[in-house]
């Protein structure tokens, strides 16, 4: 299949675990996606023509379109509208317990967790729902937890230009719970700090204290 090369060192809307040179192939059509699901059913030992599976290829293709909808969205669009009339407020803005789901890029099984996101505004703020939307944009892609954490922080720092951003993610990985070592209930915690959150220990302490209260 022919491929074209796209180079963009500043595009954090792309997963950060991709190289700055990203190979983009022609996107398959709906029929090709459904055929791929049918092939997987056959490979698993199933009969895709039995009654219960007749519509499965269509359903899976439709579900994947929603589950991986983050590829068609960008944080620039979501964070582009800000408000400057904040009566001089310049302290921490924290949105915690943002539930999300993603999919492991290694096994394509779910990652389920919650994100805590804070920033220190520099003269302007963004709608609170926009922060949750940014989490979803990056979560609805094939990911690693480390990448999601960094992408949220990097995009907010780059677009909003605040004095700092703090992100913590707590999640359970079904690739650990459902396969291999099969350890249900274990969680992974990742953090990323920029600006004042990275340079000032007291700001990190405030962030960590607030998300635990």
UniProtKB/Swiss-Prot annotation:
Cellular component terms (Gene Ontology): cytoplasm
Assigned EC number: 3.5.4.16
Pathway linked to the protein: Cofactor biosynthesis; 7,8-dihydroneopterin triphosphate biosynthesis; 7,8-dihydroneopterin triphosphate from GTP: step 1/1
Keywords: GTP-binding, Hydrolase, Metal-binding, Nucleotide-binding, One-carbon metabolism, Zinc
GO biological-process terms attached to the record: one-carbon metabolic process; tetrahydrobiopterin biosynthetic process; tetrahydrofolate biosynthetic process
InterPro entries given in the database record: GTP-CH-I_C/QueF, GTP-CH-I_N, GTP_CycHdrlase_I, GTP_CycHdrlase_I_CS, GTP_CycHdrlase_I_dom
TM helices/strands, residue ranges: none
Superkingdom of the source species: Bacteria
Catalytic reaction(s) noted: GTP + H2O = 7,8-dihydroneopterin 3'-triphosphate + formate + H(+)
Annotated Zn(2+) binding sites: 104, 107, 175
Protein name from the UniProt record: GTP cyclohydrolase 1
Organism: Brucella canis (strain ATCC 23365 / NCTC 10854 / RM-666)
